[in-house]
Amino acid sequence: MSSNDRDHRRFNSDHHSFWPNPSTYDLNSKIMLAAVASLSGVILIVFALHLYARFVLRRRREAFRGLPVIFRHPFEMPKRGLNPTVIASLPTFTVGATDGVAASATECAVCLSVLKEQDKARELPNCKHIFHVDCVDTWLTTCSTCPVCRTEVEPRPRLEPEPREGPVGTAPQLLVETRLNLTVEAASSSSSDNKTVVSPASRLNSFRKILTRERSSNRINHSCPDQDRVADLERH
């Protein structure tokens, strides 16, 4: 065997080892195409979902803008504390026997300590609960209700009675007079009704009396000629 044949065989073996088998190449290409296609499909699906989400959010924003202001904020915001001027206007006093407040029986619900004599306290106008001035003032800066009963601390406006026309004493007198007039009218109407009921009975009785009188007179008249005839016969 010559050296040329050996070189040619070596070249062919090197060539086959460098270039893969066509069947494996086709398999790898198919796998690559499937991966690219699947990745492209996932990208398209994600893009479609993104567009759909943007569309839905835009529709919701437009619908939300079209609603009235009342429906945009269905939940009320928590109320803040009172104005410092309102807090300062609340009544204060010094705890002691002269104020009518027993120091040992009253407890501040904010600091959970008993009110002592000569302590400066504040009374809430609507619920009449008593606290230390410093304690309740600190509470009212962040909350507008009583710490105990949750009643609004801000003083309520007093409703003044409407002025009445005319003196007050005239109304009962008018009522009494009208009642008296009604009773007099009722009595007169009842008496007139009684008269109208009794008058036919009295007329009937008088008519009966007249009839009896006429009958008695007729009987007397009929009996008188008979007696005259008897007297004449006796004479003859």
Swiss-Prot record:
Pathway: Protein modification; protein ubiquitination
One GO process term, biological-process aspect: protein ubiquitination
Membrane topology: Single-pass membrane protein
Annotated GO MF terms: ubiquitin-protein transferase activity; zinc ion binding
Tree of life domain: Eukaryota
Zinc finger (RING-type): 108-150
A GO CC annotation given for this chain: membrane
Top EC group: transferase
Keywords carried by this UniProt record: Membrane, Metal-binding, Transferase, Transmembrane, Transmembrane helix, Ubl conjugation pathway, Zinc, Zinc-finger
Reactions accelerated catalytically: S-ubiquitinyl-[E2 ubiquitin-conjugating enzyme]-L-cysteine + [acceptor protein]-L-lysine = [E2 ubiquitin-conjugating enzyme]-L-cysteine + N(6)-ubiquitinyl-[acceptor protein]-L-lysine
Enzyme Commission number: 2.3.2.27
Localization, UniProt: Membrane
Family matches, as SMART domains: RING
PROSITE patterns given in the database record: ZF_RING_2
InterPro entries: Znf_RING (IPR001841), Znf_RING/FYVE/PHD (IPR013083)
TM region positions: 31-51
Family: Belongs to the RING-type zinc finger family. ATL subfamily.
Function text: E3 ubiquitin-protein ligase able to catalyze polyubiquitination with ubiquitin-conjugating enzyme E2 UBC8, UBC10, UBC11, UBC28, UBC29, UBC30, UBC35 and UBC36 in vitro.
Domain comment quoted from the record: The RING-type zinc finger domain mediates binding to an E2 ubiquitin-conjugating enzyme.
Full protein name: E3 ubiquitin-protein ligase ATL41
Organism: Arabidopsis thaliana
Name of the coding gene: ATL41
